[in-house]
Regions:
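Extracytoplasmic small-molecule ligand-binding "clamshell" domains
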Residues: 25-105, 113
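Ligand-binding clefts/hinges and TM-proximal coupling segments of bilobed small-molecule sensing domains
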Residues: 25-29, 158-172, 212-215, 242-264
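Alpha-to-beta junction loops
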Residues: 40-41, 76-79, 85, 96-104, ...
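Short helix-initiation/N-cap motifs at beta->coil->alpha
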Residues: 66, 81-92, 138, 173-187
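A ligand-binding cleft/hinge motif common to bilobed small-molecule-binding domains
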Residues: 89-92, 105-114, 161-165, 186-187, ...
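Periplasmic-binding protein-like
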Residues: 123-127, 201-245, 261-264
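Flexible hinge/capping segments at coil-to-helix
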Residues: 131-149
Length: 264
């Protein structure tokens, strides 16, 4: 597989060398720039647990996307530089050439107007969370939809809307901040809460009495996560897409999901 990846790099590099000299003079592909520079610049926020977060014990970045970007740099044979950014300036950082790729974001049409997105590498969606001791009673979405269950969610969120639509036979309790749905479950005032699979994976690792029901295959309102890159550079976008395809075939992203996103 590594030989195949090296072959792709060689072919893309050869294609760039064979391009018309005038075109190359005007526009050098980002892939060529990165290989020439010897450093892959990755924008990241460090506040998207467990995808990109800062380990306060040693002040280093860790997470699903951090591991993925480190592997991308390794496979390219270059060093990695993480460039701090904010969600509000994610797009601007790519447009202004502060970094070559962003460490993963949900694909949206609004963002896609300004930046390009790679192929999806995983999906984020809504999942239920209950007490682990109730695991035998609640095994799927349907098992929660009855008059004897109470689903707690934060008031005014998308999860409140989803809970009312998904559980018409259950009691839906919307709680105001600073209360949260999962705290209501921990306190025994609610049977379940619903949240993103990203947050759920963190909750079940933090609170060993909680469990996430189902898997990525059974979550609701699924939307893809992909790597944003600058628009217009199809050599770089194709390279990233090829890398994702190869890593998916190798099981690399499955291993990251097991490490960071799967409830244990």
């Amino acid at each position: 597989m590594k030989k195949l990846f090296a072959t792709i790099v060689s072919l893309l590099t050869a294609a760039m060398l064979l391009a018309p000299a005038t075109s190359m003079a005007q526009t050098k592909s980002r892939l060529a720039q990165i290989l020439e520079r010897g450093t892959l610049r990755v924008g990241t926020t460090g506040d998207f647990n467990p995808m990109s977060l800062r380990d306060t014990t040693n002040n280093t970045l860790v997470g699903f996307d951090i591991d993925a970007m480190k592997q991308l740099a390794t496979d390219m044979g270059v060093k990695i530089e993480f460039v701090p950014t904010e969600w509000a300036t994610l797009v601007n950082g790519l447009v202004s050439d502060r970094y070559d790729i962003f460490s993963g974001a949900s694909l949206s049409m609004a963002r896609a107007k300004t930046v390009a997105f790679s192929s999806p590498y995983t999906y984020v969606g809504t999942v239920p969370v209950t007490l682990k001791k109730d695991g035998a009673k609640f095994t799927d979405w349907a098992s929660l939809n009855n008059a004897n269950t109470t689903v707690a969610v934060s008031m005014g969120t998308v999860f409140e809307q989803q809970a009312r639509a998904l559980f018409p036979n259950a009691k839906v309790r919307a709680v105001e901040k600073p209360a949260t749905g999962f705290q209501e479950v921990l306190a025994g005032r609610a049977t379940a809460t619903i949240t993103s699979n990203i947050e759920a994976s963190t909750l079940v690792k933090t609170y060993n009495t909680l469990q996430m029901i189902g898997t990525s295959a059974t979550m609701k309102e699924a939307r893809p996560l992909a790597y944003p890159v600058p628009q217009g550079d199809y050599v770089w976008l194709t390279f990233v897409n090829n890398w994702i395809s190869l890593k998916q075939a190798e099981g690399f992203f499955d291993s990251l999901e097991a490490k960071w996103l799967t409830a244990k």
